[in-house]
């Protein structure tokens, strides 16, 4: 079983036959990149997961139809405007984005997926978007993957990307994901925007299955502010260029592919959580010993979404009482008299609660852990055999500042 190799110097355009560029179309102004095109010179099969928010942005509604196409070649995405709550006009503009991209690639509009992120309820400035698409294709096929990532960022402070390679059927296979996400992150079936590309040769049904199974334990297990966006999506394109034997059953090759895809999605999820708006720390909640998989996930997410827990981590306060409180009001089945809680990092661990009762623990040692930029909260419910992990971030003064002036 095969080793997954992470290559930090590689990017989305290092996956064979994929091209990408980002340009400034004028949506954001100040010559900031705000439109990207990603496409494959070979036809792809595609899978996607989308926001469960009842209010869905126009690009999401469009993609729910286009994702069913036999072939997908491209993704076109803009930042600075969500094209959400914009009615029929917004849907028509999302289609125009696909149509304009398709014209340049000499393909059908339904073979293009569309994404937008930014302010909700403002009409999409389609003239600027069209200008941006024309500008992008005046540069392509010359690629610049970093500019493509920049073009989908809003309040993000760092780029989010990961590139892995592994072996399937004695063929080298690659997967790369780029993403944006900082605020309004509490996904259910998707993330903010995550674009994943691979040269694996796999059927559409199994690509869908692998993505949906992975999303449950990656993007769906992160939260920054408990707000599920109108625009959330994770898109996965596979062009089959690696030449591995077609994965058409849930065999060992499928398991290897699924493992690599899940690794990519988990790492991107952690990057998004760590870059929460104003965040200074990544919080990782590990729950053990739950009576069901659902209870484990519910308990872990309750810990990382608690504002009191998040604020305590920001202040390096080992206030385990807030953690057991969050477990208690969650929908998970727990027996408080069985719960153990500890704080840890990669170097040390401090137990603070045993069987629901506080311990006389070393406050300074706990504070040292909490002062770090990656805080692990371990909870053992001692109630079963199921485990789960969720990721979030601390709650800082800057979160309020950023979101108090987002439109300005």
From Swiss-Prot:
The record marks 117-118 as: Involved in the stabilization of negative charge on the oxyanion by the formation of the oxyanion hole. It catalyses: N(2)-acetyl-L-ornithine + L-glutamate = N-acetyl-L-glutamate + L-ornithine; L-glutamate + acetyl-CoA = N-acetyl-L-glutamate + CoA + H(+). It is an enzyme of class 2 (transferase). It is found in: Cytoplasm. Its main location: cytoplasm. One of its GO terms (molecular function) is glutamate N-acetyltransferase activity. InterPro entries: Arg_biosynth_ArgJ, ArgJ-like_dom_sf, ArgJ_beta_C. The record marks 190-191 as: Cleavage. One of its GO terms (cellular component) is cytoplasm. Substrate binds at residues 154, 180, 191, 277, 403, 408. The keyword Cytoplasm applies. The active site is at residue 191. One of its GO terms (biological process) is ornithine biosynthetic process. Its EC number is 2.3.1.35, 2.3.1.1. Pathway: Amino-acid biosynthesis; L-arginine biosynthesis; L-ornithine and N-acetyl-L-glutamate from L-glutamate and N(2)-acetyl-L-ornithine (cyclic): step 1/1; Amino-acid biosynthesis; L-arginine biosynthesis; N(2)-acetyl-L-ornithine from L-glutamate: step 1/4. It comes from the Bacteria. Keywords: Acyltransferase, Amino-acid biosynthesis, Arginine biosynthesis, Autocatalytic cleavage, Cytoplasm, Multifunctional enzyme, Transferase. Heterotetramer of two alpha and two beta chains. Belongs to the ArgJ family. NCBIfam families: ArgJ, PRK05388.1. Catalyzes two activities which are involved in the cyclic version of arginine biosynthesis: the synthesis of N-acetylglutamate from glutamate and acetyl-CoA as the acetyl donor, and of ornithine by transacetylation between N(2)-acetylornithine and glutamate. This is Arginine biosynthesis bifunctional protein ArgJ 1. It comes from Clostridium acetobutylicum (strain ATCC 824 / DSM 792 / JCM 1419 / IAM 19013 / LMG 5710 / NBRC 13948 / NRRL B-527 / VKM B-1787 / 2291 / W).
């Amino acid at each position: 079983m095969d080793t997954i190799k992470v290559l930090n110097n590689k990017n989305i355009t290092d996956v064979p036959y994929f091209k990408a560029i980002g340009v400034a179309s004028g949506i954001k102004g100040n010559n900031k990149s705000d439109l990207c095109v990603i496409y494959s010179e070979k036809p792809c099969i595609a899978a996607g997961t989308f926001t469960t928010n009842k209010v869905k942005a126009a690009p999401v509604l469009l993609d729910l139809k286009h994702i069913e196409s036999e072939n997908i070649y491209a993704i076109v995405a803009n930042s600075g405007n969500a094209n959400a709550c914009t009615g029929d006009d917004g849907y028509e503009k999302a289609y125009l984005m696909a149509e304009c991209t398709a014209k340049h690639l000499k393909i059908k509009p339904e073979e293009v997926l569309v994404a937008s992120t930014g302010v909700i309820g403002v009409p999409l400035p389609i003239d600027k978007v069209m200008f941006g698409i024309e500008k992008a294709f005046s540069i392509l096929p010359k690629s610049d993957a970093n500019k493509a990532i920049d073009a989908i960022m809003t309040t993000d402070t760092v780029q989010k990307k990961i590139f892995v390679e592994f072996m399937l059927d004695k063929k080298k296979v690659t997967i790369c994901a780029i993403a944006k996400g900082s605020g309004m992150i509490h996904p259910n079936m998707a993330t903010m925007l995550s674009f994943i590309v691979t040269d694996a040769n796999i059927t559409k049904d199994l690509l869908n299955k692998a993505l949906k199974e992975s999303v449950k334990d990656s993007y769906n297990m992160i939260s920054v502010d408990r707000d599920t966006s109108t625009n959330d999506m994770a898109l996965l394109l596979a062009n089959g260029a690696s030449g591995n034997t077609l994965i058409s059953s849930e065999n060992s090759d499928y398991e290897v592919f699924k493992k690599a895809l899940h690794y990519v999605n988990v790492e991107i999820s952690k990057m998004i959580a760590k870059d929460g708006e104003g965040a200074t720390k990544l919080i990782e909640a590990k729950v053990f010993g739950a009576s069901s998989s659902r209870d484990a996930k519910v308990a872990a997410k309750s810990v990382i979404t608690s504002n009191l827990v998040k604020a305590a981590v920001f202040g390096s306060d080992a206030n385990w009482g807030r953690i057991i409180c969050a477990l208690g009001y969650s929908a998970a089945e727990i027996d408080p008299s069985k719960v153990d809680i500890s704080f840890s990092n990669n170097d040390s661990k401090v137990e603070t609660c045993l069987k629901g009762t506080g311990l006389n623990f070393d406050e300074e040692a706990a504070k040292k852990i909490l002062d770090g930029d990656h805080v692990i909260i371990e909870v053992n419910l001692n109630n079963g055999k199921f485990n789960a992990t969720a990721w979030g971030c601390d709650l800082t003064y800057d979160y309020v500042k950023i979101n108090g002036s987002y439109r300005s």
